[in-house]
């Protein structure tokens, strides 16, 4: 019986296919009106609205009608006919449903849309404690909490000095302070090297001395020059001259010793500093005190599910939406201490409770991470004086900055944020024990109300006993370094020791002229314009004067401007050089007669600054510097008295290539002179 089922299915399929083919593909075209009903064909009458031309094929020769044969298999489809012209007909009625096709494995369909989330099921039994997960990334900082009530201010022992913070931005220059007490005169430093500053203005003239008595007129010949006398006694210090122009800043000196700590009023609170570099993650803190149980949640209790087997630890998923709080479960076993979580926002202030019993003193916990500074709290009651702290190590002296211009006094700045919270103080005094009330029946859970206003601060408790000093807290963020207001001037110190004698003052002005003396003509006096008599006077040589003293002198002029740097300046135009002790080719004067010489020079400055030096045997004796003013022709000069021995050499030289504006021309002369004052 079973093998005949496929045969019957094939026969039924062939019958259906043949009937369908006869009705669809053997329907005549181009016929209007009702068609005859036959047993073999059934045509549905329809109306053709198109007025197009019906295309018909060529009519063949009609054959004799043969007997009806059995239905054969459907032949292959013929070639497509010529395209017809006409409007599309009306949509036909739906055909009969075909037989069910053979079952086959289809392609997977497009995944459907996610269904609606079902209702939350009941809480299953508490699972086993899973392995400690990796700490998640640090969340963003929460909003600043509402400042709490002012605590009892108890000064603790000062902690150790923290590390030096990063230097803040440069503050505005403060007001000029009062001049300090002059210090002791330091030792004379070594000779510095630098461009000489401008000469200061001439000081005030000294007091006029009394007029001396006029001496009797002397009679006699002029004597020879005497030996130079001993240097005079150091005169009294003159009045200080007016302050000269400010010279260029000198090189930075070494940092001075730390002065004594001053006593001044605390400056106004500076602006809040820039946030410091985030510190490293601290050690995990001790577990906190368990908070009060939250309000009961609202949820439909579901059927308790069966406890499933523990599956493998999956990857940490993303944070889901916050669900409603379920009923309080049974307390489980204490799990392992996890890493400290991020600090949540501060909750609303609760109603102040009654004073509880003082708990035992806990151990000092590790320092927690620095919290965000809260708003400035109310001022607490003054605490007892703490023990004096250990003096901190003196910091390094910073480099001396350039003096800034005194700025206007600014308005007092906004109060800065309070510092980090101090360590937890000791417990207060034991309060009065309260009466335990009777436990009332548990009411139905109410709808959580809106957040109420912040309550007033509670009554401060009695100050407790002074606790042990806590561990030093982490260093706070670096604040903006601002200079505080100048403190009041302290009392004058004791008089210092007598200072060193000052430098001699400037010479005073000349005194009034004395009475005229009597004119007495000495023997051998020669009037102006009168030629001396040569009778009895010996002839003199080029190296010897009239009196028989040796002579050595010269005056030369520079004919070309801007001489070479680092070599003697060759003054090549000679006004006087009879002894030939000066060489115009090299610009060097060579001493032939040992003695005391006087040298002077006068130069012009054009184009840039000039710095000229007088050298003796390659060593500079003195310098002259002139700062050039654009559009002007400046002058500079110098002179010196030098003792020379035989074969000593003296010359002028430009030591610096940046200050070489020595100028000389045909009508603007720069000169160099020297002569023997006294032989030795």
From Swiss-Prot:
Region (Nonhelical region (NC2)): 19-56
Disulfide-bonded cysteines: none
Main localization, broad class: secreted
Signal peptide interval: 1-18
Locations listed in the record: Secreted, Extracellular space, Extracellular matrix
UniProt feature, compositional bias: Pro residues: 137-147, 207-216, 506-516
Gene3D superfamilies in the cross-refs: 2.60.120.40
Gene Ontology molecular function: extracellular matrix structural constituent conferring tensile strength; metal ion binding
PROSITE patterns, alphabetized: C1Q
Biased composition (Low complexity): 149-169, 268-289, 324-340, 366-403, 426-453
Composition skew (Gly residues), residue ranges: 314-323
Keywords assigned by UniProt, alphabetized: Calcium, Collagen, Disease variant, Extracellular matrix, Hydroxylation, Metal-binding, Repeat, Secreted, Signal
Annotated positions binding Ca(2+) 1: 626-627, 633-634
Function of the protein: Type X collagen is a product of hypertrophic chondrocytes and has been localized to presumptive mineralization zones of hyaline cartilage.
Record's protein name: Collagen alpha-1(X) chain
Biological source species: Homo sapiens (Human)
Gene: COL10A1
